[in-house]
Amino acid sequence: MNEAKAKKLTLVLHNTIINMYKIERRKTRTVKIGKIKIGSGHPVAVQSMVKVRAQNVAKSVEEIRKLEIAGCDIVRIAVEDEKDARALKDIKKRINIPLVADIHFDHRLALLAAEAGVDKIRLNPGNIYRVHEVRAVIAAAKNARIPIRIGANSGSLRIRSRDAAGALVASVVDYLKIFKKARFKDIVISLKGSDITDTITAYEKMASLCGYPLHVGMTATGLPLDGIVKSSVGIGILLFRGIGDTIRISLLDEPRQEVAVAKFLLNSLGLRNFGPELICCPACGRCEVDLLKKAQRFQEWLDKLPGAQSSKLKNLRIALMGCVVNGPGEAREADLGIAFSRHKGVLFKKGRICGTVSL
């Protein structure tokens, strides 16, 4: 086989493998949440949640503005009482991303939230289930032209079952009957559990039963590291299977950290591109520099770099490697890279050495 044929065969094999593992998203309706459209025809949206009371308008706005800077697409806020509901209008005026009112127990708070101008209402079928109450919320949403998320949680199901996944799905399916009779279709669905397997099973079943967009996440995930792992595994598997139109990484941590993890997850699956990708080796006894410190400083610089989101820079893969064993090889596979030794760093560009720097 000559060189030209070998190159052609290599290209064919490469494209075949890429297509085999390319994520094909589940086909869904499009639902508009404020200025954001979600569904299979749109990017997977990143969502987070405010961790203070809505009635504390200043603190709520402060948190949301930080989330905006972090790259959050949609923000949810708990509405516990009438004072919280009345505060939503002021919050909405001072933020730039869609606001979702999280409603439990009292459907009248959803009516006030719709009146206040929120962009979506979340209802829990486990604690707002009386038909006339749900119909009232649907009517308010229709009037305000906003969608409703049917958000089932394993911890608040009305009927307990050993089959947690089945119970989550049954809860939503039963709830959907009210919406169908009201001819309301601007719906988003979530079925969150604290068990990864149950959550995945519930979402897969629901995905086969309807064409509504799915908000994907885990609930009650534990301490921050546990939450990152559980959410990344559960959500990552679903996204890889094409399931998920908005995501939230639920963490007992700063809301901005939820957004950071969500962005890394989407970036790693090739579903969103949030800027240049930094890869580093884990370091070992051969590493003669403080690679973690260098990588952190470089990432901070990269985050502040003007134009990092431009088409020329956002697709870059940059490698910082700690020694000469795997460093040169890994750095060669990146668009730009540096392999460190004690006194110098070897610079690579598109696989070729382009210089050295003294340390």
Question: What is the role of each PLM region?
Answer:
Residues 68-90, 122-130, 187-196:
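Glycine-rich, proline-tolerant flexible connector loops at the mouths of alpha/beta enzymes
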Residues 117-131, 218, 241-255, 340-353:
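Glycine-rich phosphate-binding active-site loops on the catalytic face of alpha/beta enzymes
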Residues 17-49, 300:
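N-terminal amphipathic alpha-helix/helix-capping segment at the start of soluble metabolic enzymes
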Residues 44-50, 75-77, 99-103, 121-123, ...:
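Hydrophobic faces of well-ordered beta-strands that scaffold small-molecule active sites
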Residues 108-149:
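Hydrophobic or amphipathic alpha-helical targeting/insertion segments
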Residues 41-59, 78, 97-105, 160-169, ...:
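Active-site mouth loops of central-metabolism enzymes
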Residues 153, 160-306:
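Catalytic alpha/beta core domains of metabolic enzymes, predominantly
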Residues 82-101, 136-148, 206-214, 301:
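Alpha-helix-loop-beta-strand connector modules within alpha/beta enzyme cores
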